[in-house]
Amino acid sequence: MASIGQASVAHISGGELLEAGYPTIHAVGRASDEEPRLIDLRWGSLKAPKVTLIGKGVCFDSGGLDLKPSDNMLLMKKDMGGAAHVLALAKFIMEAELDIRLRVLIPAVENSVSGSAFRPGDVIKTRSGKTVEIGNTDAEGRLILCDALAEASQESPGLMIDIATLTGAARVALGTEVAAMFTNNEELAEELSNQSVVQQDPLWRLPLWGG
C-alpha cells in the first residue's frame, strides 16, 4: 500500500521498542513469538495540514494472564479492526491525493500467554512519563494506544483520530450496530455524526471525562 502511494514506512520492533521509549507496546506484546512493533507511515507534502491516524493493532487477543473464556476468544483475530480501518482510510486519502500531511501509527501486537507475559499488579512507566498499574491484562488496547498517542502528540497535528476495538462496554452501552465516538472537537463531532447518518454507519457520541 505504501509503495502505491509513495509513502514512507518505518517500524520499531521487539527490544528496540524499549530503547526507543515505547514500554507499554513492548509489555503487551512481549509474550508472543511474533515481536510487537510500532508501524509508522508518512505521506504528503510537508507544507500541508497535519493529520494523524492511530489504529489499535492487536492481531490476536487471548486476554494474557487474565485469560479470556474460550467463547470470548474465538473472534479475537478481529481485535486489529482499528488498524485495518486506519489503513483503509489512509489508502483512500492517498488515492484521492488529498492535500494533507498524513501520518499513520499502528501499534501491532499479540496479547499472548507465556512466562514473559506482563502481569496483573505490574507498574509500567509509559512514553508520556506517567505510570500505570496493571489491573487486568485483558485491558491491553489502551496500553498500546497510550504510547502511540504520546508519540503522535509530540508533532502537534491539526487533527488526530484513533480507532479501536477498545472495550465490550461500548457494546453494552450502545448495542452491536452503533459505534461509540469520543471527541473534544465540537465541529468534528457534528460533522461525523451527520455523515454517519448519511452513510448509514451510525456513531453515537459519549462524553470524555477527566475525573
Q: Where in the sequence are the language-model features?
A:
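A generic structural signal for tightly packed, nonpolar segments enriched in small/aliphatic residues
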Residues: A2-G211
